[in-house]
Amino acid sequence: MRGERRRRALVVVLVVLGLVAVVASPAAALHAPTHRRGPSASRSGRPYPCAPGPDGTIQGPNADASAIGWEGNAQGVVACLGGSFYVQDGIDTTYGYGVYDDTKTTWTNVGGYLPALRSTFHRAGAEISITNFGDDVQLASGAFVVVYSRVAIHNATSHAVMIDPQASPRLISLNLAPLRVGPGATVDHDYVVAADRFGQTTPWPTAGALQAAGGYDAHFAHMQAFWVAQLASIAQVRVPDPGLDDAYRAGFIYTQIVRSGDHLDTGVNGYASEYSHDVIGILANLFTQGDFNGAHDLLLEARDVVGTQGQYLDGYWTYSWPWAIYLLKTGDLALVQANFSTEGPDGTSTPSIEDTAHRIAADRVGATGIMGRTDDIDTLGSWTVDNYEALMGLAAYRYLAERVGDASEASWAASEYDSLLAATTATLDATIHRYHLRYLPCSMTDPNDFNRCSNAEDANWAAPFVFGRWAWDGALFGATITGPGADLIDATYDYGFGRLKTTLPANTFGGYPDDYYSSGYNAGYGSWGLASAAHRDQGIRSYEFMIQRTQSGPLSWWESVSAPNPASPWIGSHPARGQGSSPHAWGMANANKVLLDSLAAERSDGTLIVGRGIPSSWTRSGRSISVANFPTTDGHTVGFTLATHGLTVSWSSIGEPTTGPVLLELPTFVNNIRHVTGGAADRRAGTVTVAPGTDHVVVELAHPA
């Protein structure tokens, strides 16, 4: 999908006779008319549009789209600007408030990251905010995702104002609030509507049942507590850019809302389905973060997806990768052994880990021995990225074979890896020599001028750098990293950005037809930068670009976007068009993985790499970085802080003591270490090696960062 394709419930006990009644049709009692409270001095209007467009993708007229809902809901709710939202699950209806009139608006996640989206604007001297969120509500009739909505009107004037929220007729009132708002006062209008049934066919609840299930504040508190607890279970980050902290948290939450049961869908609209390589990338990131909730079912669901979907072969080849991360982090050898060489109930359509690795050998072609032609970047070709993905799959498979004690398969994987690496290197060397190239081409056999990468703004020029995984993630699993894919990383970044210098801002890689400004994978394209010398912080810089320039919902991004629309009512820089889905779970997975990898990454031998991708500006005096609850080998976790005071950078371990070596590899350390206390320095490489169990290291710099 790089171009043109594509509970912890608040239990409510209802004891009032009749309140547990349900109806079969959502158009009846579920959507009872809003209680009207007299005339309003405000003009009457329709809610801001939020509905499917000609291509079926749900969004607002300014390409605005995000999501609210609950973990594992069948169909998340699409949220748009101005407090409007679109409920799916057979209801297929837009809800919103006519009081919103497309005036200049801020649109944010409450608390910076929660899936409670707030639009704030001004009218008649009043500040009006509309907040929507989803909560998991258990009624006697079943489990539901219920949307709670508040229109808060604050009168900052010295005279009374009359403002009617003008709620959609089928929204259900939760309180009787006046339309008159006195000077300096705030009035809250609260509403509710059921939105999802977790894939069941349970009849929808009545208006009375929803009203009796509790008010806005109680459900907000439950929603907030749930997501805070979920975030506490994964690796936590704090960096000098708080926008990245919030994006990391919001990305995890959106992924859980986009998820439909055990199906790791890519979006709640547009791409509301599973795609093989998307699922692999999403799962790899969740395991890297330390989210193993339902891991067994998710791994087997991924098996079913890669085994039956013929669209993308690379998902099949890399199926071993999330398994390897899972085993490294959890030590759950029994689960891996049970699925290593044993197929699922449908034979090769539910392949074993071994099946997927051996498919790599079967898919190599011709005298060159490279991977065959695929449509993995949504255009048929002999793509460089495919060969590096296959190498990644083999590296992960070798690790798994060694861990389960299958010496024969480990030997086969090592031999196949060496053979494919040699073939890849020879073919690329020949292409580079024949056409006098100074970059890694996106095709194995042709220069970029001969294919879709001739368009400088087509981000596939950097496809190996995110989807290939190999140069960075392969190295983490002990793979040999040599050849053009290792040698030309910096040169290829320079080449690609050089072509974009006159057409696009810095730190965007371009997009896909016909929205070439940027993409949801923009941060992920910096992944191979972690294996480079000069672009180690590219992932973070490109993530910051996404936050500053291309949000299409609060901390939510389309797969591909056009340039910003200055006429949008949403204050800031936001794309005029988008395609795919927003939020986009695979894009967020790549962004959050490169952020976390830039701060902390673990090798399969237990070595912890710290700070390899952090910008030098983050180590200026007075700044600090922390990582907590980072998952390491066999179920352990570690944490640390990095703090700079003057020319001194201090690393301190928090939580469990480290059990393996720690490598402090901050870019600012390269040729800039004066003295180290608590570790051994390689000044030229800029690496400080810390022995296991050490809890404090001090590095004195020669020059300021």
Predicted regions and their residues:
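Secretory targeting and sorting signals
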Residues: 2-31
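Ser/Thr/Asn(+Pro)-rich, low-complexity disordered segments
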Residues: 17, 21-24, 145, 173-216, ...
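Terminal accessory carbohydrate-recognition/targeting modules of carbohydrate-active enzymes
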Residues: 30-245, 604-705
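Amphipathic, well-ordered alpha-helical segments in soluble domains
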Residues: 87-88, 92, 115, 291-294, ...
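The feature captures the catalytic groove of carbohydrate-active enzymes
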Residues: 180, 184-216, 309-314, 358-419, ...
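Substrate-binding groove/exosite segments of carbohydrate-active enzymes
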Residues: 222-347, 372-374, 379-382, 455-482, ...
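Non-catalytic carbohydrate-binding regions of carbohydrate-active enzymes
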Residues: 408-450, 483-646, 653-656, 665-677
